[in-house]
Amino acid sequence: MIEYRIEEAVAKYREFYEFKPVRESAGIEDVRSAIEHTNLKPFATPDDIKKLCLEARENRFHGVCVNPCYVKLAREELEGTDVKVVTVVGFPLGANETRTKAHEAIFAVESGADEIDMVINVGMLKAKEWEYVYEDIRSVVESVKGKVVKVIIETCYLDTEEKIAACVISKLAGAHFVKTSTGFGTGGATAEDVHLMKWIVGDEMGVKASGGIRTFEDAVKMIMYGADRIGTSSGVKIVQGGEERYGG
């Protein structure tokens, strides 16, 4: 069934796909509410995470995205706010065993995570091991039922048909979002990739653009081409850029 669904999606892409914006514009509040303020640096300190959380509260961002060891701290810093705590699983390579990813997700939720960004097994995807990729994603989704799971497909390593396959499998496996990049690969988000991903998953799933988004204009472009969330370490700079251009 998985292979058939992929082939069907590829055929539709070849016949009907057209690259064009999915919305006419995006304002400051659209950008603000889409941002997942991110610090996944290997040298991030507790003070760095506290600062990240403070900035997210002050700017009313959707969430913060932190490494697993800082989930509990972020939860404490954001207590009493609507800011979500997002963390990563199988990060950044996606090459962990499936059961390891599932346990990582469980521990993250127990520590206070609201959302999980898991990395797909890129090698298995490129080898067309569709069932493996499906079960890898499904195991994480099932292990944290009720929590949002985003699948990082690492677009910089994939050709168009592989991007389509990754999106189709993520949808079949019950994930809630597909995400462009870890930020540790050879490239980040592009409007072309974001639009393709949204075209494949439709309105039933979200798309998170991440990697190289540093300005207000970058964020607006991603949203106009289909991004529902923006993963960036430049959240404050992005919003300030919008305020300078259009007023607070």
From Swiss-Prot:
Pathway: Carbohydrate degradation; 2-deoxy-D-ribose 1-phosphate degradation; D-glyceraldehyde 3-phosphate and acetaldehyde from 2-deoxy-alpha-D-ribose 1-phosphate: step 2/2. The active site is at D117, K179, K208. One of its GO terms (cellular component) is cytoplasm. One of its GO terms (biological process) is carbohydrate catabolic process. Its EC number is 4.1.2.4. It comes from the Bacteria. Keywords: Cytoplasm, Lyase, Schiff base. Catalyzes a reversible aldol reaction between acetaldehyde and D-glyceraldehyde 3-phosphate to generate 2-deoxy-D-ribose 5-phosphate. Belongs to the DeoC/FbaB aldolase family. DeoC type 1 subfamily. HAMAP family: DeoC_type1. This is Deoxyribose-phosphate aldolase. The gene is deoC.
